[in-house]
Curated annotation (Swiss-Prot):
Any GO molecular function: metal ion binding
Alphabetic keyword roster: Magnesium, Metal-binding, Methyltransferase, Transferase
Gene expressing this chain: ICS2
Annotated function: No detectable N-methyltransferase activity.
UniProt protein name: Probable methyltransferase ICS2
Cofactor note: Binds 1 Mg(2+) ion per subunit.
Keyword Transmembrane helix recorded: no
InterPro entries in the cross-refs: MeTrfase_7 (IPR005299), MeTrfase_capping (IPR042086), SAM-dependent_MTases_sf (IPR029063)
Site (described: Involved in substrate discrimination): 148, 220, 264, 312, 327
Family of this protein: Belongs to the methyltransferase superfamily. Type-7 methyltransferase family.
Biological process annotations from GO: methylation
Chain sites annotated for binding S-adenosyl-L-homocysteine: 18, 61, 98-99, 133-134
Length: 364
């Protein structure tokens, strides 16, 4: 099965669903709303208010409430600017994109009562689902004015290439992501894959976004130059330990562990900046990295803290993990993961690093 068929957040509205476990993403989205508000204001300063409709896309939208916040913010800012400029009311067309396996049913069920259908709305809003990979083309040329994406662009199209020796041996044995014990070739392979995929993303958007159009991208990243620092490896490192314990119990085939590498990469600011500048289609209007404590760290009881952390981790890791190791082992795996997290959190409480990036499409 290809990554694009297995990469999605846990579905439904149960305890381990993404819809119920995306509070941190909501926090990040809320914190970065002033940046999105400023992006909308900038569009109006470039005469985008003369249009009949503003076309916006939320890429990698998943099925949590963050999308509702994004749409509401764009609508509110459009209404504010239309009143200030005394211009005709624009309509808002929003495209919600994610891979076909995404839980669009839960997304649109929540959307209908929160964003659309308001009889008193100043800016009419029309929402369309667009299943597909954002690493390729999704929209017609010069059709988008604003693109938003939160916690999606760091996912890769595939596990990095070149992680097997000429003799067929796994080069990242016993690990599922970059680790302190990983050889340099593993780090190089991950960066190379991110470079390739992010470049594809930029190339596709460069054709779809109108000149002077804007993109607001938020992704997991790191402040350190070392990709094996715990700020970016914590969850994957502990999951690898949990999987290895099940291997030792004969519940998982060791070869499945040795040949699995997570299709995700948390880049540094310098790496992101370098790729954008090399691409040459967009200017960087704003870029910063910031750290936040995981919300589970506010819990005093270590078991409650560990269980909540594991539940959130399961929401975004289970689909890709179960695709490799089997659905039948998931409850046991995440139970083991919870125990490991509880013992590890007493010594390490890593902050979560995010990168926010505002890009403008170059004219000409």
């Amino acid at each position: 099965m290809e990554v694009k068929e297995a990469l999605f957040m846990n579905k439904g509205e149960g305890e381990s669903s993404y819809a119920q476990s995306s509070s941190f993403t909501e926090t990040v989205t809320s914190m970065t709303m002033p940046v999105l508000e400023n992006a909308v204001e900038t569009l109006f300063s470039k005469d985008f208010h003369l249009l009949q409709a503003l076309n916006a896309a939320d890429l990698g939208c998943a099925a949590g409430p963050t999308t509702f916040t994004v749409i509401s913010t764009i609508k509110r800012m459009m209404e504010k600017k239309c009143r200030e400029l005394n211009c005709q009311t624009l309509e808002l067309q929003v495209y919600l994109n994610d891979l076909p396996g995404n839980d669009f049913n839960t997304l649109f069920k929540g959307l209908s009562s929160k964003v659309v259908g308001n009889k008193c709305e100043e800016v009419p809003c029309y929402v369309v689902g667009v299943p597909g990979s954002f690493h390729g083309r999704l929209f017609p040329r010069n059709s988008l004015h604003l693109v938003h994406s939160c916690y999606s662009v760091h996912w890769l199209t595939q596990a990095p290439k070149g992680l097997t020796s000429k003799e067929g041996l796994a080069l990242n044995k016993g690990k599922i992501y970059i680790s302190k014990t990983s050889p340099p070739v593993v780090r190089e392979a991950y960066l190379s894959q991110f470079h390739e995929d992010f470049t594809m993303f930029l190339n596709s958007r460069s054709q779809e976004v109108v000149p002077n159009g804007c993109m607001v991208l938020i992704l997991r990243g790191r402040l350190s130059s070392d990709p094996s620092d715990m700020e970016s490896c914590f969850t994957w490192e502990l999951l690898a330990v949990a999987i290895a314990e099940l291997v030792s119990q004969g519940l998982i085939d060791e070869d499945k562990l040795d040949t699995f590498n997570v299709p995700s990469y948390f880049p540094s600011l310098e790496e992101v900046k370098d790729i954008v500048e090399r691409n040459g289609s967009f200017t960087i209007d704003h870029m910063e990295g910031f750290e936040l404590d995981s919300p589970q760290m506010q819990e005093n009881d270590k078991w409650v803290r560990g269980e909540k952390f594991a539940t959130v981790a399961r929401a975004f890791t289970e689909p890709i993990i179960s695709n490799q190791f089997g659905h039948e082992i998931m409850d046991k795996l995440y139970e083991k993961f919870t125990h490991i997290v509880v013992s590890d959190l007493e010594a390490k409480i890593p902050k979560i690093t995010s990168i926010i990036l505002v890009l403008s499409k170059i004219v000409g």
